[in-house]
Amino acid sequence: MKEQITYDIFDKVDIRVGTVISVKKNEKARKPSLVVEVDFGEEIGIKQSSAQITHYYSEENLKGKQVIAVCNFVEKNIAGVVSQVLILGSIDKEGKVILVHPSQSSENGLPIS
């Protein structure tokens, strides 16, 4: 387990629900990656992320799906892509990412607490 944090620290993390609207391969990345655009509703808008999720996910099975992401992460340039959010997932025994998503359809932009 990682170091414990206080509620005040956790409360600073802005985690939201969004819907994937586009997916394409990041051809410049050293490791197979996808550039994912996610709609987080009116308040936050559309944000993009570069994610190493190609083992289980593709444009065909990811577009239209809802995901959970950290929306106030500092932007990072990853292989020519400005990654604006961090899409959340669990990591299986082989190191492959399994995305976290709501169990029911949710409004884009709803906060996770």
What is each model feature region?
Residues 1-113:
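Phosphate-backbone binding interfaces of nucleic-acid-interacting proteins
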